[in-house]
Amino acid sequence: MRTQGKRAVSAAALLLATAGAVVAGGGPASATAADCSNGANGFVTVSDNASGAVARHIEPYPEFIINLEYGTIGGVQRGFARLRGRTVQGDKVWMDWTRDAGRTWIQCGPFTVSYLFAPKTSAAQRTSRDANWRFRACGRGSGANESFCTTWW
């Protein structure tokens, strides 16, 4: 029994050390909305009324819908984040973009909802067949402490 206890403690220590290394290695590099709009860093501005095919979807609160969508914009297939539903002024949406399968990423935004029930989109970035080039959509309700993100696509 004593040996099993030591193994369990050793396994737990290894798991914690490994998890800590993974968390310590990744993270976002923030970019403001200006860093992701009007052609900056390859991003293009998208109308807040734009919609595309839904690649990922979460609804953390009833009718608070965060989508990762894609569509042809200016002749190029691009991905973007979209917040819709029962939005209020101050709700935020952004898109995370990675070129290394999620080890590090750029947070493009946040973009802020300006009035009640208004949809809001992030800027859009071209898609790629490269498996390391991924997006996820994220959002946070006005005054909330917790953010929600889709899985990577």
Label for each model-derived stretch:
Residues 30-153:
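Post-signal peptide N-terminal regions of Sec-secreted extracellular proteins
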